[in-house]
Amino acid sequence: MSETSGEKLNIEYKQEYVSDIKKEVIAFANAEGGTVFVGICNDGAVKGVDDPDEVMLRIVNSLKDAIAPDVMPFVRVDSVAIEGRNVIEIQITTGTNRPYYLREKGLKPGGVYVRKGSSSQPMTEEGIREMLLQNSGRSFELCRSMTQELT
């Protein structure tokens, strides 16, 4: 696997486990999905992790505790060998209960993230409203107007 050529729209590298991984997972679940690699530097250099089981446990517990609604059905966390080193691969698919957000921040900018280019950005209030409408199966265009004339 030689995906280590730098971050892309659907790939994020983290040299080590840091708590902002939650933001990356939220951003991918709210967008088109993606993969976060822990143990790879931003430039693609493979560093690896010392204790993959402990890192995976920390990641899973962090995601379960910090993200609402539950994102875990759309996340897979594995230990993989890249260039002979243990790296954690977090695969995220697009969630069905979007928008996902940080519990402590709530359903507002600063709590909701989306992937834009090769970075995760806070969503605007307008973007959050749009996503809520899309996810509820309703869009503005499909809402019935009380003054609409039927032909």
Task: Please report, for each region that a protein language model flagged, where it lies by residue.
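Conserved N-terminal catalytic/coupling substructures associated with nucleotide/phosphate chemistry
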Residues: M1-T151
